[in-house]
Structure formats: structure tokens, C-alpha cells
Amino acid sequence: MPSRRHALVLQDRRAVRIVALVLLALAAAYQCFWRIADENIGGDESTYVRAGFAYVHGAFDQNREHPPTAKYLFGLAQLVGGEGATAPRVLVSALVVLGAAVMFVWLRAEVGFWAGWTAAALWTLTPRGGSGARLDRVALLDPVMVFFALAALFAVWTWTRTGRWWWLPLSAVLMAASVTSKASTLVLVPVFLLAPLLFRQWRRLVVGGVVWAVVFTVTVVALYAPMGIRSAVLYMLAFQEGQNENGHLAVIAGQTHQFAPWWGNWWFLAQGVGLPVLVVLAAGVLLAVVVRPDRLVVFLAAPLLLLVAFYSVAAKIALPTYYSAWTPWIVLLAAVGLGRLAVLRPRPLTGALAALLVVVALVGSIPTARAVWQTRPEGVARLLPLLRSEGIRDGRIFFGAITPSDYDQYVGARGVRDVDDAPFEAIVVGRDQRFPLPQEVTDLLRDERSSFERVRLDRIVVWIPDGEIERDADGELDVR
């Protein structure tokens, strides 16, 4: 009888786990893919998508300031799914789901089923703001870089744990794909020596390190070869050095910075994930460090510390998407911490507390789920249909308080931001304080308010004149 009861308990437990996985898969599919084609196309995304399409057709002159691999994949996706941003977006979201699978398999083996499930849930469902409803629903380089780095570190850990030789070269190939998607993860290369060090596998450290380095180098060269590796790398280094020296305008905590403060990417992290999720992640990481820290915790903390140091100290700029490089390691550590909390005594209490923290994070994801549900073209994406309905089919459009990358792909050469380019058929005003309105435009909108129809399109305002906006001999703007 006891054995039969035990079998029924195991069967019930298996059923609960299957249901949990199915529910997570459905929620992840929704969060990652629902209305994925309806997001506005950002400037960087448009650049990478166009460059990828050019690369697979043999033209490598675009976007040489970044490595090519992610753009190769974007180009291949367009060959399969059609030209444009949708197919690359589907690819990026698929990599997010694959990353969740890697996390689940990794932590399920090392900590337990629910730790793996928690990592996958935190990775696929929680907010990551910075571009669109979630920054890994658009075709940016960062999510591709992150996936390959995550898979590479999982592979080298598995090689160390199992001794199966083929995991080692696979890890090197995956890491080469990460570095040649975006170079930031180059700082993680020392971590690949850490795994055999942690297990005191000295022979594997020496022999495996040499094999890994050779495979990594050969793969990097092969991936860069179509671009011309020497010229491409030199151009990339010169560009990145110039950007670090000259800075990059960013609005952080309400202030415009040319050179970001060291905490800039931390601020974007807090804004991107939201307070409830941030608290849960911080608690989970703290628990991982405090409750039975082991080799796995050290191995996961190493890439987090290296990337935080790079983005907080070495890099002089901060952008809303940069923190995404840290998030897989934060998520993994948090899941480890919550998983180990759940098995402390008294288990009913600690298990309930761990479950409560996971629920808080999932509840904190509801705004992202709502944003995904409500995703549609907005702002500048709706501008040209509005102007056509007003009878404006050509002519220049003046843009102020809005970054050029937001409108270039929608209006092309019609979009200008210099009053010397008058006449204009309309004025579009955004909210980006990095690009303030010229005084001439401010004066025109104040003094000749009655000459304009004012239409709000989400976060922009379109001023449609009852004539044409021209510049007179005194440099003033008038509606004529």
C-alpha cells in the first residue's frame, strides 16, 4: 500500500509539472510572439535588418561598426520569411525561448525542476523595457549576443560536469557567435577558464583551454571573413573608440547626459524591469549568495560581475538596452536562490515564501502582457496616413524633439530637422529633450496657433498648417 501511495504521489507531482510547463510555454509564446509584427520599427532595428539583407546578398558596406553574425541571421530570416523586420523579430523571440530552455535544463540538473521552471518563467515573462513592449521582441543585436553567450557558458559547464568532449568546441563556436554578434561579451572569455578551475581539473584547464581558444579564433575569423576581417575590425574599433570619447546623448533620470554616469545602466535596468520584479531578482540573487553558495553560484556570478564592470566603468555611454546583457545571469542567480530557499527548513514556510516571490514577479509582468496585447503601430508609423488624409502627399516635414532614428524609416528624405530646409508641409513634435525645438518653430506655433490643426498621435503632436510653412528674409517662419 505505501508503495502504491508513493507511486500516486509521484504521478500527481509529474502531472503538476507537466501542467506547469505547458502553461509556461503558452504564456511565453504569447509574451514573445503575439502581434510581433505590429511594433514600430526603430532606427537601430531598421539599420540591422537592412544590413542583414544586404549581407546575404554579398554587400558588406553597411553597419560595419558592429560585428556581422546577428545580421547574417537577420538576413537569412528574411530569405525565409520575407524582407522586412518581422522575420528577424521572430528569430530573436525564438532565441529568447531557446534561452529559456537552456536555463531550464541547466538549473533542473543542478538545483531542481522548480528552479529551472522559475528561471525560464523569469526570462520569458518579466518586463525588459527599452524598446517596444519588450526589447527582445525587436531585431536588435543584444538579444542575439546574449543567447549565444548563455548557451556557450552552459556548454562549457556541461563539458566540465560530464566530460563529453564535444561540448567544449561547441562552447567555443557559440561564444564566437556571441562576440561576432556584438563585441561586449568579449569580456566573458576568462569565464571559460573558470569552470575547470572550480572543479580543479588541471589537465582540462590546459588542454581544453588551448582547444577552446583555437576553435574560438577560427570561428571568429570564419564569421568575419566575408566582411574582410582586418578592415572591419579596425573600423569597428575606431568607431567604438570615437563613441566612447565623444559620448552619446541619453536621458537618464530626467537629465540629458553626453557621458553617462556610472549608474546609468542600473537606472535603465530599474526602469526596464519595474520595481516588483527588481525586488524579487535582488532577493533571489542575495539568497543565492547567502544560502549554500557553491561552484554554480560562483560560475554564474562571474559573467554578471564582468559585464557590470564593463558597462559601469569601462563604457562611457549608457543606453536603454545595454542592461539586457546582465539579465540572464541575474535571472539564473535569482532562480538558484529561490530554488534553494524553497528546500530550507521548515519547508512549508520557505517553500511558500519562494512561491510568493515568484508570484510577485509574475504579477509584476502583467503590464508587459497588457502592452503586448495592445501593441499596434503608433506615433510616426501613423503619420503618413494622417497627412494623406489631409491631402498632403509630398513635401518636407519638420521634426523636433524626436530622434531621427524614430522617423527616418517612415518618411525618408522628407523628414528634416533644420529650419533652413523650409518650406515644410507639417511640423511633428515629440518628447525627446535631447533634441529641443528651435526657437523659430516655438515662436511660430505660439504666434500663429490659429493657422494650424493640432493632431495628437500617441507620443507625438502633428501641427498641420492651412498653407505652407516658409522662411522669410529675416529668418522667421510663416504660414503662407
Language-model segments: residues:
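Membrane-interface transmembrane helices that cradle and orient dolichyl/undecaprenyl
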Residues: 110, 150-167, 178, 197, ...
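Hydrophobic/aromatic-rich transmembrane helices and adjacent perimembrane loops
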Residues: 136, 142-145, 187, 274-275, ...
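Short periplasmic/luminal acceptor-recognition loop of GT-C membrane glycosyltransferases, typified by
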Residues: 373-380, 388-436, 460-464
